[in-house]
Amino acid sequence: MRIGNEYAAKTLCKAVQACYNFSVYTEDGTNETTGRSYMENKLIRSKYFLYLTEFFAGMSVMAVELGASRLMAPYFSSSQIVWTVIIGVIMIAMAIGNVWGGKLADKSATPDKLYRRLIIAAIWIALIPFVGRYLIAGISLLLALFVTKNFLVWAALAACLVIFAFPCVLLGTVTPSLTRFTVDNLDDTGKTVGRLNALNTIGSIIGTFVPTFVTIPAVGTAATFLIFSGVLAAIGIAYFVFEKKKSVPGIVSVLLIAGLCFALPSYSFAFWQSDITLEDESIYNYLQVQDDAKRTTLSTNVLFGVQSVQVKGDALTGMYYDYALAAPCMAGMDGTDNENRSVMILGMGSGTYASYCTRYFPGASVQGAEIDKKIADIAKDYFGLPGSVTVAVEDGRAYLAASKEKFDVIMVDAYQDITIPFQLSSVEFFNEVQAHLKPNGVMVVNLNMTSAENGSINEYLCDTMAS
Protein backbone atom coordinates (compact mmCIF):
# COMPACT_ATOMS: atom_id res chain seq x y z
CA MET A 1 0.00 0.00 0.00
CA ARG A 2 2.84 2.35 0.89
CA ILE A 3 4.61 1.61 -2.41
CA GLY A 4 1.40 2.41 -4.27
CA ASN A 5 1.04 5.72 -2.47
CA GLU A 6 4.62 6.74 -3.24
CA TYR A 7 4.13 5.85 -6.90
CA ALA A 8 0.90 7.85 -7.05
CA ALA A 9 2.58 10.83 -5.39
CA LYS A 10 5.50 10.78 -7.83
CA THR A 11 3.11 10.47 -10.78
CA LEU A 12 1.10 13.45 -9.52
CA CYS A 13 4.25 15.54 -9.04
CA LYS A 14 5.40 14.79 -12.58
CA ALA A 15 1.98 15.74 -13.93
CA VAL A 16 2.11 19.08 -12.08
CA GLN A 17 5.65 19.69 -13.34
CA ALA A 18 4.55 19.02 -16.90
CA CYS A 19 1.53 21.33 -16.64
CA TYR A 20 3.35 24.29 -15.04
CA ASN A 21 6.84 23.77 -16.44
CA PHE A 22 8.33 23.34 -12.96
CA SER A 23 11.77 21.83 -12.57
CA VAL A 24 12.61 19.59 -9.62
CA TYR A 25 16.27 19.00 -8.76
CA THR A 26 17.93 16.41 -6.60
CA GLU A 27 20.52 17.29 -3.96
CA ASP A 28 23.36 16.99 -6.51
CA GLY A 29 21.66 19.51 -8.80
CA THR A 30 20.22 17.03 -11.32
CA ASN A 31 16.83 17.76 -12.89
CA GLU A 32 14.54 14.80 -12.21
CA THR A 33 12.59 15.40 -15.41
CA THR A 34 15.42 15.92 -17.91
CA GLY A 35 18.28 14.23 -16.09
CA ARG A 36 20.44 17.32 -16.66
CA SER A 37 22.53 18.95 -13.94
CA TYR A 38 22.41 22.71 -13.42
CA MET A 39 26.15 22.64 -14.10
CA GLU A 40 25.32 21.82 -17.72
CA ASN A 41 23.73 25.26 -17.94
CA LYS A 42 26.19 27.50 -19.81
CA LEU A 43 24.96 30.57 -17.96
CA ILE A 44 25.70 28.97 -14.60
CA ARG A 45 28.89 27.22 -15.66
CA SER A 46 30.50 30.45 -16.87
CA LYS A 47 29.99 31.96 -13.38
CA TYR A 48 29.99 35.51 -14.74
CA PHE A 49 26.23 35.70 -14.52
CA LEU A 50 26.38 34.43 -10.94
CA TYR A 51 28.93 37.09 -10.04
CA LEU A 52 26.72 39.71 -11.69
CA THR A 53 23.79 38.47 -9.62
CA GLU A 54 25.81 38.84 -6.40
CA PHE A 55 26.84 42.36 -7.39
CA PHE A 56 23.30 43.57 -8.07
CA ALA A 57 21.92 41.84 -4.98
CA GLY A 58 24.37 43.74 -2.77
CA MET A 59 23.58 46.97 -4.60
CA SER A 60 19.84 46.49 -4.15
CA VAL A 61 20.10 45.87 -0.40
CA MET A 62 21.82 49.20 0.19
CA ALA A 63 19.49 51.00 -2.19
CA VAL A 64 16.54 49.66 -0.20
CA GLU A 65 18.20 50.79 3.04
CA LEU A 66 18.81 54.31 1.75
CA GLY A 67 15.34 54.41 0.25
CA ALA A 68 13.88 53.25 3.56
CA SER A 69 15.37 56.23 5.38
CA ARG A 70 13.90 58.66 2.87
CA LEU A 71 10.49 56.98 2.82
CA MET A 72 10.25 57.02 6.62
CA ALA A 73 11.76 60.48 7.16
CA PRO A 74 8.58 62.50 6.52
CA TYR A 75 6.73 60.39 9.08
CA PHE A 76 9.37 59.60 11.73
CA SER A 77 12.24 62.02 10.89
CA SER A 78 15.73 60.91 9.86
CA SER A 79 17.23 60.98 13.34
CA GLN A 80 19.83 58.53 14.62
CA ILE A 81 17.04 56.60 16.34
CA VAL A 82 15.26 55.95 13.04
CA TRP A 83 18.52 55.08 11.30
CA THR A 84 19.31 52.58 14.06
CA VAL A 85 15.92 50.92 13.58
CA ILE A 86 16.35 50.71 9.80
CA ILE A 87 19.88 49.30 9.92
CA GLY A 88 18.99 46.86 12.69
CA VAL A 89 15.90 45.48 10.95
CA ILE A 90 17.68 45.04 7.62
CA MET A 91 20.67 43.32 9.23
CA ILE A 92 18.36 40.94 11.11
CA ALA A 93 16.46 40.22 7.89
CA MET A 94 19.69 39.57 6.00
CA ALA A 95 20.91 37.21 8.73
CA ILE A 96 17.67 35.24 8.56
CA GLY A 97 17.98 35.14 4.79
CA ASN A 98 21.55 33.86 5.03
CA VAL A 99 20.51 30.96 7.26
CA TRP A 100 17.44 30.14 5.20
CA GLY A 101 19.36 30.47 1.94
CA GLY A 102 22.00 28.04 3.17
CA LYS A 103 19.36 25.44 3.98
CA LEU A 104 17.66 25.93 0.61
CA ALA A 105 20.96 25.60 -1.23
CA ASP A 106 21.73 22.28 0.47
CA LYS A 107 18.21 20.94 0.13
CA SER A 108 17.54 21.80 -3.50
CA ALA A 109 20.44 23.00 -5.59
CA THR A 110 18.53 24.75 -8.38
CA PRO A 111 19.15 28.22 -9.78
CA ASP A 112 15.47 28.42 -10.79
CA LYS A 113 14.28 28.97 -7.24
CA LEU A 114 16.97 31.55 -6.51
CA TYR A 115 16.07 33.71 -9.50
CA ARG A 116 12.38 33.29 -8.76
CA ARG A 117 13.06 34.69 -5.29
CA LEU A 118 14.91 37.63 -6.83
CA ILE A 119 11.92 38.48 -9.00
CA ILE A 120 9.55 38.25 -6.03
CA ALA A 121 11.86 40.59 -4.08
CA ALA A 122 11.85 42.98 -7.05
CA ILE A 123 8.04 43.03 -7.11
CA TRP A 124 7.90 43.77 -3.37
CA ILE A 125 10.50 46.56 -3.64
CA ALA A 126 8.61 48.16 -6.53
CA LEU A 127 5.45 48.29 -4.43
CA ILE A 128 7.14 49.78 -1.34
CA PRO A 129 6.79 53.52 -2.11
CA PHE A 130 3.20 53.14 -3.28
CA VAL A 131 1.88 50.82 -0.57
CA GLY A 132 4.38 51.69 2.18
CA ARG A 133 3.08 55.22 2.80
CA TYR A 134 -0.37 53.84 3.61
CA LEU A 135 1.10 51.10 5.80
CA ILE A 136 3.19 53.63 7.73
CA ALA A 137 0.15 55.84 8.34
CA GLY A 138 -1.99 52.86 9.35
CA ILE A 139 0.63 51.36 11.66
CA SER A 140 1.22 54.74 13.32
CA LEU A 141 -2.47 55.31 13.94
CA LEU A 142 -2.90 51.79 15.33
CA LEU A 143 0.08 52.04 17.69
CA ALA A 144 -1.04 55.48 18.86
CA LEU A 145 -3.97 53.73 20.54
CA PHE A 146 -1.73 51.49 22.67
CA VAL A 147 1.77 52.95 22.91
CA THR A 148 2.31 55.78 25.38
CA LYS A 149 6.12 55.76 25.67
CA ASN A 150 8.80 55.74 22.97
CA PHE A 151 6.16 55.92 20.25
CA LEU A 152 8.69 56.96 17.61
CA VAL A 153 10.84 53.89 18.24
CA TRP A 154 7.98 51.39 18.25
CA ALA A 155 6.19 52.89 15.26
CA ALA A 156 9.37 53.06 13.18
CA LEU A 157 10.29 49.50 14.18
CA ALA A 158 6.87 48.10 13.31
CA ALA A 159 6.73 49.93 9.98
CA CYS A 160 10.25 48.85 9.06
CA LEU A 161 9.54 45.20 9.88
CA VAL A 162 6.34 45.10 7.87
CA ILE A 163 7.65 46.96 4.83
CA PHE A 164 11.34 46.15 4.46
CA ALA A 165 12.09 42.85 6.21
CA PHE A 166 10.63 40.43 3.64
CA PRO A 167 12.57 41.54 0.51
CA CYS A 168 15.78 41.71 2.54
CA VAL A 169 15.25 38.14 3.76
CA LEU A 170 14.92 37.05 0.12
CA LEU A 171 18.04 39.00 -0.87
CA GLY A 172 19.85 37.42 2.07
CA THR A 173 19.40 34.00 0.45
CA VAL A 174 21.45 35.01 -2.58
CA THR A 175 25.01 34.57 -1.28
CA PRO A 176 24.58 31.04 0.19
CA SER A 177 22.88 29.87 -3.00
CA LEU A 178 25.49 31.41 -5.28
CA THR A 179 28.24 29.86 -3.17
CA ARG A 180 26.71 26.44 -3.87
CA PHE A 181 26.60 27.12 -7.60
CA THR A 182 30.04 28.71 -7.99
CA VAL A 183 32.24 26.41 -5.88
CA ASP A 184 33.51 23.60 -8.12
CA ASN A 185 36.02 22.01 -5.80
CA LEU A 186 37.60 22.54 -2.40
CA ASP A 187 40.84 23.85 -3.90
CA ASP A 188 39.35 27.22 -4.90
CA THR A 189 36.60 27.58 -2.30
CA GLY A 190 38.24 30.48 -0.48
CA LYS A 191 38.97 32.38 -3.68
CA THR A 192 35.45 31.90 -5.00
CA VAL A 193 33.72 32.91 -1.77
CA GLY A 194 36.05 35.90 -1.41
CA ARG A 195 35.19 37.01 -4.93
CA LEU A 196 31.47 36.73 -4.21
CA ASN A 197 31.81 38.78 -1.02
CA ALA A 198 33.92 41.39 -2.80
CA LEU A 199 31.33 41.80 -5.55
CA ASN A 200 28.56 42.04 -2.98
CA THR A 201 30.49 44.75 -1.14
CA ILE A 202 31.27 46.68 -4.33
CA GLY A 203 27.61 46.50 -5.27
CA SER A 204 26.70 47.76 -1.79
CA ILE A 205 29.06 50.72 -2.20
CA ILE A 206 27.43 51.69 -5.48
CA GLY A 207 24.01 51.10 -3.95
CA THR A 208 24.98 53.59 -1.24
CA PHE A 209 26.26 56.43 -3.41
CA VAL A 210 23.94 56.27 -6.42
CA PRO A 211 20.63 56.73 -4.55
CA THR A 212 21.98 59.48 -2.30
CA PHE A 213 23.81 61.57 -4.87
CA VAL A 214 22.08 60.68 -8.14
CA THR A 215 18.66 59.08 -8.24
CA ILE A 216 16.90 60.50 -5.15
CA PRO A 217 17.81 64.18 -5.83
CA ALA A 218 17.18 63.72 -9.57
CA VAL A 219 14.00 61.63 -9.75
CA GLY A 220 12.89 61.02 -6.15
CA THR A 221 12.56 58.15 -3.71
CA ALA A 222 9.69 56.36 -5.47
CA ALA A 223 11.52 56.28 -8.79
CA THR A 224 14.66 55.07 -7.01
CA PHE A 225 12.80 52.05 -5.67
CA LEU A 226 11.49 51.33 -9.18
CA ILE A 227 14.94 51.63 -10.75
CA PHE A 228 16.57 49.14 -8.42
CA SER A 229 13.60 46.78 -8.44
CA GLY A 230 13.80 46.87 -12.22
CA VAL A 231 17.46 45.87 -12.09
CA LEU A 232 16.67 42.91 -9.83
CA ALA A 233 13.77 41.83 -12.01
CA ALA A 234 15.93 42.10 -15.13
CA ILE A 235 18.52 39.73 -13.64
CA GLY A 236 15.87 37.14 -12.80
CA ILE A 237 14.10 37.46 -16.14
CA ALA A 238 17.41 37.21 -18.04
CA TYR A 239 18.06 33.85 -16.40
CA PHE A 240 14.69 32.39 -17.37
CA VAL A 241 14.91 33.80 -20.91
CA PHE A 242 18.34 32.24 -21.40
CA GLU A 243 17.04 28.95 -20.02
CA LYS A 244 13.97 29.23 -22.27
CA LYS A 245 11.66 28.71 -19.31
CA LYS A 246 8.41 30.41 -18.43
CA SER A 247 8.32 32.62 -15.35
CA VAL A 248 4.98 33.92 -14.13
CA PRO A 249 6.64 36.19 -11.49
CA GLY A 250 8.84 37.60 -14.25
CA ILE A 251 5.84 38.54 -16.38
CA VAL A 252 4.10 40.04 -13.35
CA SER A 253 7.18 42.11 -12.46
CA VAL A 254 7.44 43.58 -15.96
CA LEU A 255 3.77 44.57 -16.05
CA LEU A 256 3.81 45.91 -12.49
CA ILE A 257 6.97 48.00 -12.74
CA ALA A 258 5.90 49.41 -16.11
CA GLY A 259 2.49 50.31 -14.70
CA LEU A 260 3.96 51.96 -11.60
CA CYS A 261 6.25 54.08 -13.78
CA PHE A 262 3.15 55.70 -15.27
CA ALA A 263 1.89 56.42 -11.75
CA LEU A 264 5.04 58.34 -10.76
CA PRO A 265 3.96 61.81 -11.97
CA SER A 266 1.04 61.82 -9.52
CA TYR A 267 3.01 60.28 -6.62
CA SER A 268 3.00 62.18 -3.32
CA PHE A 269 4.25 61.36 0.18
CA ALA A 270 1.47 63.46 1.68
CA PHE A 271 -1.31 61.54 -0.03
CA TRP A 272 -3.99 63.13 2.19
CA GLN A 273 -3.14 66.70 1.13
CA SER A 274 -4.17 68.39 -2.09
CA ASP A 275 -2.95 71.95 -1.52
CA ILE A 276 0.80 71.37 -1.87
CA THR A 277 2.55 74.01 -3.95
CA LEU A 278 5.85 72.14 -4.22
CA GLU A 279 6.92 68.65 -3.25
CA ASP A 280 10.55 67.82 -3.91
CA GLU A 281 13.57 65.94 -2.59
CA SER A 282 17.18 66.97 -2.17
CA ILE A 283 20.30 65.17 -1.02
CA TYR A 284 19.39 66.07 2.56
CA ASN A 285 15.63 66.48 2.80
CA TYR A 286 12.09 65.80 1.72
CA LEU A 287 10.75 69.28 0.93
CA GLN A 288 7.20 70.59 0.96
CA VAL A 289 6.02 74.14 0.29
CA GLN A 290 2.44 75.23 0.92
CA ASP A 291 1.16 78.60 -0.17
CA ASP A 292 -2.22 80.14 0.57
CA ALA A 293 -3.74 83.61 0.79
CA LYS A 294 -2.30 84.28 4.25
CA ARG A 295 1.11 82.63 4.42
CA THR A 296 3.80 80.45 2.84
CA THR A 297 5.31 77.55 4.77
CA LEU A 298 8.22 75.16 4.31
CA SER A 299 8.37 71.67 5.83
CA THR A 300 11.40 69.39 5.69
CA ASN A 301 11.08 65.70 6.55
CA VAL A 302 8.14 66.41 8.84
CA LEU A 303 4.62 66.22 7.45
CA PHE A 304 2.87 67.48 10.57
CA GLY A 305 4.97 70.57 11.31
CA VAL A 306 6.69 73.48 9.59
CA GLN A 307 10.25 74.75 9.59
CA SER A 308 9.60 78.20 8.13
CA VAL A 309 6.58 80.51 8.05
CA GLN A 310 6.25 83.74 6.11
CA VAL A 311 3.10 85.84 6.44
CA LYS A 312 1.91 87.64 3.31
CA GLY A 313 2.36 91.41 3.34
CA ASP A 314 4.51 93.26 5.87
CA ALA A 315 3.16 91.57 8.99
CA LEU A 316 5.20 89.48 11.39
CA THR A 317 4.32 85.83 11.94
CA GLY A 318 2.90 86.37 15.42
CA MET A 319 4.88 83.32 16.54
CA TYR A 320 7.93 82.91 18.73
CA TYR A 321 10.15 83.40 15.66
CA ASP A 322 9.54 87.13 15.89
CA TYR A 323 11.37 87.42 19.22
CA ALA A 324 14.66 86.81 17.42
CA LEU A 325 14.37 90.33 16.00
CA ALA A 326 15.28 91.62 19.47
CA ALA A 327 18.86 90.39 18.93
CA PRO A 328 19.87 93.16 16.46
CA CYS A 329 18.41 95.75 18.84
CA MET A 330 20.45 94.28 21.70
CA ALA A 331 23.54 94.59 19.49
CA GLY A 332 22.89 98.31 18.99
CA MET A 333 21.22 98.21 15.57
CA ASP A 334 18.21 100.42 14.82
CA GLY A 335 15.66 101.08 12.11
CA THR A 336 17.54 103.87 10.33
CA ASP A 337 21.24 103.58 9.63
CA ASN A 338 23.01 100.24 10.01
CA GLU A 339 26.02 100.73 7.78
CA ASN A 340 28.92 98.46 8.78
CA ARG A 341 26.50 96.30 10.73
CA SER A 342 26.17 92.61 9.90
CA VAL A 343 23.96 89.61 10.61
CA MET A 344 24.92 85.98 10.04
CA ILE A 345 22.28 83.22 9.97
CA LEU A 346 23.43 79.63 10.38
CA GLY A 347 20.70 77.46 8.91
CA MET A 348 19.04 80.14 6.83
CA GLY A 349 16.21 77.91 5.61
CA SER A 350 13.60 79.85 3.65
CA GLY A 351 15.20 83.16 4.64
CA THR A 352 12.31 84.48 6.75
CA TYR A 353 14.62 85.93 9.40
CA ALA A 354 16.94 87.31 6.73
CA SER A 355 14.03 89.08 5.03
CA TYR A 356 12.87 90.61 8.31
CA CYS A 357 16.39 91.83 9.10
CA THR A 358 16.67 93.62 5.74
CA ARG A 359 13.21 95.15 6.29
CA TYR A 360 13.57 96.36 9.89
CA PHE A 361 17.32 97.07 9.94
CA PRO A 362 18.04 98.69 6.55
CA GLY A 363 21.65 99.02 5.50
CA ALA A 364 22.82 96.00 7.47
CA SER A 365 24.73 93.27 5.68
CA VAL A 366 22.75 90.03 5.98
CA GLN A 367 24.35 86.69 5.18
CA GLY A 368 23.25 83.10 5.57
CA ALA A 369 24.69 79.60 5.46
CA GLU A 370 22.38 76.82 4.27
CA ILE A 371 23.65 73.29 3.66
CA ASP A 372 20.80 72.33 1.32
CA LYS A 373 21.00 74.06 -2.07
CA LYS A 374 17.40 73.25 -2.93
CA ILE A 375 16.23 75.02 0.23
CA ALA A 376 18.32 78.05 -0.75
CA ASP A 377 16.63 78.00 -4.17
CA ILE A 378 13.19 77.67 -2.54
CA ALA A 379 13.97 80.76 -0.42
CA LYS A 380 14.41 82.78 -3.61
CA ASP A 381 11.63 81.23 -5.68
CA TYR A 382 8.83 80.91 -3.11
CA PHE A 383 9.71 83.16 -0.15
CA GLY A 384 10.99 86.22 -2.00
CA LEU A 385 14.44 86.28 -0.41
CA PRO A 386 15.92 89.76 -1.09
CA GLY A 387 18.74 89.79 -3.62
CA SER A 388 20.93 91.68 -1.14
CA VAL A 389 21.13 88.61 1.12
CA THR A 390 24.24 86.53 0.48
CA VAL A 391 23.79 82.77 0.80
CA ALA A 392 26.65 80.29 1.21
CA VAL A 393 25.59 76.72 0.42
CA GLU A 394 27.54 74.83 3.05
CA ASP A 395 27.46 73.63 6.64
CA GLY A 396 27.16 76.47 9.15
CA ARG A 397 29.97 75.33 11.43
CA ALA A 398 32.30 74.73 8.48
CA TYR A 399 31.47 78.19 7.17
CA LEU A 400 32.41 79.84 10.46
CA ALA A 401 35.62 77.83 10.73
CA ALA A 402 36.73 79.04 7.29
CA SER A 403 35.64 82.67 7.77
CA LYS A 404 37.59 85.46 9.45
CA GLU A 405 34.66 87.87 9.40
CA LYS A 406 32.97 89.06 12.58
CA PHE A 407 29.28 89.86 12.98
CA ASP A 408 27.03 91.93 15.21
CA VAL A 409 24.43 89.15 15.33
CA ILE A 410 24.78 85.42 14.73
CA MET A 411 21.50 83.54 14.51
CA VAL A 412 21.79 79.76 15.10
CA ASP A 413 18.74 78.21 13.47
CA ALA A 414 20.01 74.94 11.99
CA TYR A 415 17.81 71.91 12.39
CA GLN A 416 17.89 68.32 11.22
CA ASP A 417 14.19 67.54 11.02
CA ILE A 418 12.99 68.37 14.55
CA THR A 419 16.37 68.18 16.31
CA ILE A 420 19.38 70.47 16.63
CA PRO A 421 22.47 68.88 15.02
CA PHE A 422 24.82 67.81 17.79
CA GLN A 423 27.79 69.54 16.14
CA LEU A 424 25.92 72.84 16.52
CA SER A 425 25.28 72.41 20.23
CA SER A 426 28.74 71.72 21.62
CA VAL A 427 31.14 73.85 23.67
CA GLU A 428 33.54 73.98 20.73
CA PHE A 429 30.83 75.31 18.43
CA PHE A 430 29.75 78.06 20.80
CA ASN A 431 33.40 79.06 21.27
CA GLU A 432 33.61 79.34 17.47
CA VAL A 433 30.52 81.55 17.43
CA GLN A 434 31.93 83.77 20.18
CA ALA A 435 35.15 84.19 18.21
CA HIS A 436 33.12 85.55 15.27
CA LEU A 437 31.13 88.09 17.26
CA LYS A 438 32.08 91.75 17.37
CA PRO A 439 32.38 93.47 20.76
CA ASN A 440 28.85 93.67 22.20
CA GLY A 441 27.76 91.17 19.56
CA VAL A 442 24.77 88.90 20.23
CA MET A 443 24.13 85.22 19.54
CA VAL A 444 20.51 84.10 19.29
CA VAL A 445 19.56 80.40 19.21
CA ASN A 446 16.27 78.88 18.10
CA LEU A 447 15.52 76.14 20.66
CA ASN A 448 12.01 75.43 19.34
CA MET A 449 10.96 74.07 22.74
CA THR A 450 10.33 75.25 26.28
CA SER A 451 10.48 73.44 29.58
CA ALA A 452 10.63 74.55 33.20
CA GLU A 453 11.59 71.09 34.46
CA ASN A 454 14.99 70.29 35.90
CA GLY A 455 17.22 68.40 33.50
CA SER A 456 15.46 69.71 30.39
CA ILE A 457 17.24 70.25 27.08
CA ASN A 458 16.98 74.00 27.66
CA GLU A 459 18.91 73.73 30.92
CA TYR A 460 21.63 71.54 29.44
CA LEU A 461 22.07 73.72 26.37
CA CYS A 462 22.26 76.90 28.45
CA ASP A 463 24.90 75.28 30.66
CA THR A 464 26.85 74.33 27.53
CA MET A 465 26.72 77.91 26.24
CA ALA A 466 27.78 79.30 29.61
CA SER A 467 30.79 77.02 29.79
Language-model-detected regions and their locations in the chain:
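Conserved phosphate-coordination/catalytic loops
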Residues: 63, 314-319, 394, 423-427
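Short, surface-exposed charged micro-motifs
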Residues: 286-288
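Short, conserved active-site loop motifs that form the nucleotide-linked donor/cofactor pocket
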Residues: 388-390
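Class I SAM-dependent methyltransferase Rossmann-like catalytic core
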Residues: 308-324
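Short linear segments in intrinsically disordered or otherwise low-structure-confidence regions
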Residues: 3-4, 10
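Alpha-helical transmembrane segments of multi-pass membrane proteins
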Residues: 16-280, 291-294, 302-307, 329-342, ...
